[in-house]
């Protein structure tokens, strides 16, 4: 398949992804914050992820600066990644729908915050993070570019491994034994195998 066609496919998926986040994110942002945990370095990590999930992929699409890092992956692998991305956007939409107004881009507890344990959250505590792992991997494969793939994965891994323990600590503080019990029944990124 023509390289420009892959770029168009990626842009279509990217626009849908941004649209879903905008629709649900705007609704969720209307809820006021009750408690925020914002370590100083987290802004830097979020910015690093912006570079990995937005800036570099769009640079790969709209310029030739990263062309020397192209991988030349077979179309079959890129097509598989595109299908996974399409399904992953469906997952992303479901995650946002299940979370409702409880979603936040930062670590915070909102007024009226509820512990969501229904829908996809019945079996997985952090499906949004599972989605983002898939996103950074598949965008690098679709665009067939080492920089997009590796930078996206590394930037996301750093944020993920620093943020998740702090997020779970915040949720234990807010929901106590209910969250601890929930942790025992669910997996972080995948359903728990008993």
From Swiss-Prot:
Record-linked InterPro entries: ICMT_MeTrfase, Isoprenylcys_mtase
Keyword Cell membrane: yes
PANTHER family per the UniProt record, alphabetical: PROTEIN-S ISOPRENYLCYSTEINE O-METHYLTRANSFERASE (PTHR12714), PROTEIN-S-ISOPRENYLCYSTEINE O-METHYLTRANSFERASE (PTHR12714:SF9)
Residues exposed to the Cytoplasmic side: 29-37, 99-125, 167-194
NCBIfam families in UniProt: isopcys_mtase
UniProt-annotated binding residues for S-adenosyl-L-methionine: 108, 113-116, 121, 126-129, 167
Membrane spanning stretches: 2-28, 38-62, 74-98, 126-144, 146-166
Pfam families: ICMT (PF04140)
Assigned keywords, A-Z: Cell membrane, Membrane, Methyltransferase, S-adenosyl-L-methionine, Transferase, Transmembrane, Transmembrane helix
Result, substituting residue 163 to A: Abolishes FTA methylation
Any GO MF annotation of the entry: protein C-terminal S-isoprenylcysteine carboxyl O-methyltransferase activity
Name of the protein in its database record: Protein-S-isoprenylcysteine O-methyltransferase
Binding site for substrate: 163
Keyword Transferase: yes
GO CC terms: plasma membrane
GO biological process: methylation
Compartments where located: Cell membrane
Protein role: Carboxyl methyltransferase with activity toward prenyl lipids. In vitro, displays activity toward N-acetyl-S-farnesyl-L-cysteine (AFC) and S-farnesylthioacetic acid (FTA), an analog of AFC.
Enzyme Commission number(s): 2.1.1.100
Membrane-side (Extracellular) residue stretches: 1, 63-73, 145
Family note: Belongs to the class VI-like SAM-binding methyltransferase superfamily. Isoprenylcysteine carboxyl methyltransferase family.
UniProt topology in membrane: Multi-pass membrane protein
Reaction(s) the record says it catalyses: [protein]-C-terminal S-[(2E,6E)-farnesyl]-L-cysteine + S-adenosyl-L-methionine = [protein]-C-terminal S-[(2E,6E)-farnesyl]-L-cysteine methyl ester + S-adenosyl-L-homocysteine
């Amino acid at each position: 398949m023509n390289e420009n066609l892959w770029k168009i496919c990626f842009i279509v998926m990217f626009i849908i992804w941004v649209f879903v986040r905008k629709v649900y994110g705007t609704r969720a942002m209307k809820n006021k914050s009750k408690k925020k945990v914002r370590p100083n370095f987290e802004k830097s990590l979020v910015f690093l992820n912006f570079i990995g999930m937005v800036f570099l992929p769009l640079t790969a699409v709209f310029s030739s600066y990263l062309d020397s890092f192209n991988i030349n992956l077979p179309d079959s692998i890129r097509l598989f990644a595109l299908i996974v991305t399409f399904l992953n956007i469906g997952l992303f939409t479901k995650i946002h729908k299940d979370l409702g107004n409880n979603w936040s881009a930062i670590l915070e507890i909102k007024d009226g915050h509820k512990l969501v344990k229904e829908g996809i959250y019945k079996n997985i505590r952090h499906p949004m993070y599972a989605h983002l792992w898939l996103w950074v991997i598949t965008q690098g494969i679709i665009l067939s570019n080492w920089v997009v793939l590796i930078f996206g994965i590394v930037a996301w891994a750093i944020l993920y491994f620093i943020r998740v323990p702090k997020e779970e600590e915040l949720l234990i503080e807010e929901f106590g034994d209910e969250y601890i019990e929930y942790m025992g029944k669910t997996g972080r990124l995948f359903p728990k195998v008993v």
